[in-house]
Amino acid sequence: MTQVAKKILVTCALPYANGSIHLGHMLEHIQADVWVRYQRMRGHEVNFICADDAHGTPIMLKAQQLGITPEQMIAEMSKEHQTDFAGFNISYDNYHSTHSDENRVLSELIYTRLKENGFIKNRTISQLYDPEKGMFLPDRFVKGTCPKCKSPDQYGDNCEVCGATYSPTELIEPKSVVSGATPVMRDSEHFFFDLPSFSEMLQAWTRSGALQEQVANKMQEWFESGLQQWDISRDAPYFGFEIPNAPGKYFYVWLDAPIGYMGSFKNLCDKRGDTVSFDEYWKKDSDAELYHVIGKDIVYFHSLFWPAMLEGSGFRKPTNLFVHGYVTVNGAKMSKSRGTFIKASTWLNHFDADSLRYYYAAKLSSRIDDIDLNLEDFVQRVNADIVNKVVNLASRNAGFIAKRFDGELAAELADPALYQTFTDAAAVIGEAWESREFGKAIREIMALADLANRYVDEQAPWVVAKQEGRDADLQAICSMGINLFRVLMTYLKPVLPELCARAEAFLNVELTWDGVNAPLLGHKVNSFKALYNRIEMKQVEALVEASKEEVKAAAAPVTGELAENPIQETITFDDFAKIDLRVALIENAEFVDGSDKLLRLTLDLDGEKRNVFSGIRSAYPDPQALIGRLTVMVANLAPRKMRFGISEGMVMAAGPGGKDIFLLSPDSGAKPGQQVK
């Protein structure tokens, strides 16, 4: 190994924990994984980490809609996300969550250092407030009519029709997306990060030459328009970390989200019992390399706020950002109605992971270009390249080696010059992997595959096999073909981990980057089994149809009682524990003079009598029928003075009202006074 081993930390953008992973996400995670696998093959110390981005208003509100706690929701999402990434063989060393002890400690540390260094400012701002939900509204949680083009139903920050940007206060007839209420303006003290103080440092970082040209150019535009102070706080209710010494104020999700990179790495170090590496990687003068693989939509946060936060709190800055474009399918934005908004899990029900990994790699470069997943081209390319060119090379030769030579390869290379051509290509292909010019690497490898297949075509082992006295030639030709296959698979190992594992089992040797310098001579291979099957358009059709069906299922309207009476906001166990429910015997029931809705119930709690007024008369026109029944009551409800007397509790009933009211009754065996738990 001539290279000096490097210490490298690689991250992907943290998936938001309120939805499933789809093929747009997978572009980034595949791109990063291919680069990481190549670095590992070259002997570098690589730590590859990620986490779920688990904070913010959308998560809080979605959990409420589902009737579960945010903690429950993000735990379920984390399991789903990790299953999807494992299915695509994304080789993370650690996958964590921003809702973690490590992230809380680091977020508070960075904030405290920024505050101590004078980079946190306080000021009062006016925001739209939902009076029904009792919460301030983020821009995307306000909708109204665009103030520019007058298009209805537009978000509070920009119009999707005319493209205009504006303040949510400029919307015409704004409404809260959460409750439908008309928001009002309210003042609140917020905390701001003084980003303009870091303008000079950020411009120097931009000019260093490390960033992609397109990123540097975009940053220059932001510098010219002037950097603004960044609001890093949000008001309760909010799911996130409370700001130290600021009750009711929480860190904005974009403050603690990138710190999640540090939190995940700290968690990994702690799991390993490693007390040294975290500081080695994150200290200001660290010689480790730090790379963030991200989409072009979050460059602003990663190229401005994040390095400035790190600089201001005494940590190192990223070595570079690797930015990619978006994914389109069949030349258009992913569409749920067309079945091209495809979840990662749905893909894996119809295709293997290697097929998408290969197709994305074949199209990726170091530029920030959008990638189109053309499903017809996908089928053709996978079959033409992986099946016809690479796998076919092994299958054309393996049978002869197994049947005629008991799996043993020849002792010498049939064409050393051709083999040298293949091994010499390692420099060009390696540089392409290194510089993230994946498409170029694939083109170079497929050009070699064409050479290998041309060699086999010219040598025609199927003809030689029929000629007497040419066993040595047959063994040499087929051994040459298998050795060339081994080189190709070695170069493809960062992209095709599943296929390469099967190839290693057949070749009876591990595929290592430097290993190709020594061909397999006199080496015994194992029996050949089909390495990869052709894919068909009917699989694509099934995939698209399955995606459509998933959308229909997800969009199915809620019917029945939940539609009429949605589950209310989540409460804590402590809140529930305050309610004292007891079994009660209805000792007497009678009409209430002057009321056509109420019945007066005398309830026996086995030693204590309660007088309760209940609005159940419409369902029980004969109150005498209730006498002697057991029911359930709220025993610690504060007494309520009514026109007819004092009500000392509440009986429990179900139903929408009118005649459809159903008094709850405990199962047989329950006794008056027993607590309902």
UniProtKB/Swiss-Prot annotation:
Cofactor(s) this protein cannot do without: Zn(2+)
Binding site for Zn(2+): 146, 149, 159, 162
EC code: 6.1.1.10
SUPFAM superfamilies given in the database record: Anticodon-binding domain of a subclass of class I aminoacyl-tRNA synthetases (SSF47323), Methionyl-tRNA synthetase (MetRS), Zn-domain (SSF57770), Nucleic acid-binding proteins (SSF50249), Nucleotidylyl transferase (SSF52374)
Enzymatic reactions: tRNA(Met) + L-methionine + ATP = L-methionyl-tRNA(Met) + AMP + diphosphate
Biological process annotations from GO: methionyl-tRNA aminoacylation
Top EC class for this record: ligase
One GO molecular-function entry: tRNA binding
Quaternary data: Homodimer.
Similarity-based family: Belongs to the class-I aminoacyl-tRNA synthetase family. MetG type 1 subfamily.
Function: Is required not only for elongation of protein synthesis but also for the initiation of all mRNA translation through initiator tRNA(fMet) aminoacylation.
UniProt protein name: Methionine--tRNA ligase
Originating gene: metG
